[in-house]
């Protein structure tokens, strides 16, 4: 099972956790969880007026072996108005996830993706935990 938590943070409410959203999905091949502004297709949706977040920004996909990966989907802009940083538990520093890039999530692993606005002190913070059950 993949568990996601999402919080939106701006300069006015930095450090606040009010409004945290959660979603989870079983680790079945082909299962998808999306993060973005489009509430029709995204399980976790950011504010509609936060245009630095694409309609569908991040896609978590479960592969045939039950492992998960996350992709920063390319949007309508050649250069995105945001950046995405990936932090994995046990590693000291966040790494940039390239625009259109994919990262594999370790089974049983956890971490955080931060969608950072390049023009204002706002971010969407998405925590993840891949729960693995023994067979």
Describe each PLM feature range:
Residues 43-46, 72-75, 79, 91-93:
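Functionally constrained cores in energy, signaling, and assembly domains
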Residues 82-95, 116:
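Short strand-turn-strand beta-turns centered on an Asx-Gly dipeptide
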């Amino acid at each position: 099972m993949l568990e996601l938590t999402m919080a939106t943070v701006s300069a006015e409410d930095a450090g606040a956790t009010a409004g945290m959203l959660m979603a989870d999905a079983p680790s079945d091949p082909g299962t998808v969880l999306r993060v973005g502004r489009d509430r029709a297709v995204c399980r976790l949706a950011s504010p509609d007026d936060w245009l630095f977040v694409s309609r569908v920004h991040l896609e978590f996909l479960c592969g045939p072996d039950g492992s998960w990966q996350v992709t920063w989907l390319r949007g309508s802009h050649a250069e995105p108005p945001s950046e995405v940083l990936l932090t994995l538990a046990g590693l000291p520093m966040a790494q940039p996830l390239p625009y259109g890039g994919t990262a594999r999530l370790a089974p049983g692993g956890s971490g955080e993706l931060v969608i950072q606005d390049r023009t204002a002190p706002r971010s969407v913070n998405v925590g993840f935990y891949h729960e693995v059950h023994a067979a």
